[in-house]
A protein has these predicted regions:
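PRPP-associated nucleotide enzymes
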Residues: 1-211
Length: 211
């Protein structure tokens, strides 16, 4: 009962993340000397590699060292986040992941990056659930550990979340509508699924001072 894989497409909202980040942040230098992409764990490396390649940035990764002798809340607890990559000192970092559940792992990653003297920390995830509430994110923002949190509107966003000064709502409505329209007209999805050209145009406008 194997499901054929060739009928599935991976849709990455990278263009939308960059678009909304640049819209809300001025004077970012998007090059390998001033910015890095970070994967919070080994499972998200494919996503982060794509993100880094499209933007022409260096990549760093954390792996979770776990205590396999104990189980806490149904999981082996994380003992430490070990970092693999070049120095983040003085650089802006973009942490890329698919989901924020409780956010504990993401915040631990941000804290470790700040300990390593990263400049600004931006968190980009497709689905933001925030199952443990927003108090920890508030605390980390107030303490200067995180600067922005970007999640899409593909899941419900509470009014409380939308009101946070650090939160950026990444609207996917137009992109999803274009995908549906192309499918209904049997058109190619290639240009929609590969955002490189659109991102390059966006970066050119940003660097030229256009918003």
């Amino acid at each position: 009962n194997a499901i054929p894989l060739n009928g599935f497409e991976t849709v990455q909202p990278i263009y939308q993340f960059i678009k909304y980040l640049l819209k809300n942040e001025k004077d970012l230098q998007i090059d390998s000397e001033h910015m890095m992409v970070i994967s919070p764990d080994e499972g998200g490396m494919g996503r982060a590699v794509f993100f880094a390649n499209v933007l022409g940035l260096d990549l760093g990764m954390f792996y979770k060292r776990r205590d396999y002798t104990r189980i806490v809340n149904g999981r082996n607890p994380i003992v430490a986040h070990e970092f693999l990559g070049s120095s983040v000192e003085g650089k802006d970092v973009i942490i890329v992941d698919d989901m924020i559940s409780s956010g504990e792992s993401m915040l631990d990653t941000a804290k470790e990056l700040k300990r390593r003297k990263a400049r600004k920390v931006f968190i980009c995830t497709t689905f933001g659930l925030f199952t443990n509430g927003l108090s920890k994110f508030d605390e980390y923002y107030e303490n200067g550990i995180i600067d922005r949190v970007l999640t899409t509107n593909l899941v419900y966003q509470t009014p409380e979340l939308l009101s946070k000064p650090y939160y950026i709502d990444v609207d996917m409505s137009k992109y999803i509508a274009l995908i549906i329209d192309n499918l209904n007209h049997d058109s190619s999805l290639s240009d929609l699924l590969n955002p490189t050209k659109r991102i390059n145009r966006l970066l050119e406008k940003y660097r030229a001072g256009e918003r």
